[in-house]
């Protein structure tokens, strides 16, 4: 079930840096990842499902909408919601424990997809390779980014499996780089009741490789 953005955004407490249309994350369904130019201006990050707390709010909105459309199934929807929130809370704590003892590290991502995840778990993303994944970044941006990275002794660079960007390897030639890959689209995650739990663990495991 997909909800109109206007209905969802009015129902969510989006106190972080960005807003977006939402998909049914409770069922682990995937979404269309087309980005308009407006979506990548400033600090916009539409990937709100990467913050588990916002995902709980999304699940609550979905529950409310489902009970309106199918009132006879309200008790089953409520049980599903409670189970999902409980499982997600357990996953959140496990992930928080993963990152809790790690020393600060400069993290760069391919594009602005992981802001919500990083903020939720206290990780610091210092920069992105490109604002929009569909277009190659400009030479000026790559040059400035390369100079910035060269001043650091070690960074972690988070790639994405759906986009090839060979220029990534050249911008940090004189810096120790830990490469990892994270998929904000959950393209390899099975669409199942625990799909979102598996998904958020996969993102956490990818970022944890930065510290290994």
Give residue ranges: language-model regions.
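Extracytoplasmic metal-acquisition and chelation regions
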Residues: 1-212
């Amino acid at each position: 079930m997909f909800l109109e953005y206007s209905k969802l955004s009015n129902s969510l407490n989006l106190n972080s840096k960005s807003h977006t249309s939402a998909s049914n994350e409770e069922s682990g369904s995937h979404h269309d990842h087309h980005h308009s130019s407006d979506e990548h201006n400033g600090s916009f990050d539409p990937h709100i499902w990467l913050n588990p707390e916002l995902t709980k709010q999304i699940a609550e909105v979905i529950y409310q909408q489902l009970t309106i459309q199918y009132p006879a199934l309200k008790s089953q929807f409520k049980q599903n919601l409670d189970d999902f929130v409980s499982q997600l809370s357990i996953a959140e704590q496990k992930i928080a424990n993963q990152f809790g003892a790690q020393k600060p590290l400069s993290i760069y991502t391919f594009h602005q997809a992981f802001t919500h995840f990083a903020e939720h778990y206290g990780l610091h993303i210092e920069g992105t390779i490109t604002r929009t994944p569909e277009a190659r970044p400009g030479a000026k941006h790559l040059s400035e980014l390369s100079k910035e990275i060269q001043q650091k002794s070690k960074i972690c660079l988070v790639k994405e499996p759906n986009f090839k960007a060979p220029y990534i390897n050249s911008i940090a030639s004189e810096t120790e780089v830990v490469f990892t890959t994270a998929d904000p689209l959950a393209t390899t995650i099975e669409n199942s009741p625990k799909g979102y739990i598996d998904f958020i663990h996969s993102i956490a495991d990818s970022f944890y490789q930065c510290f290994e």
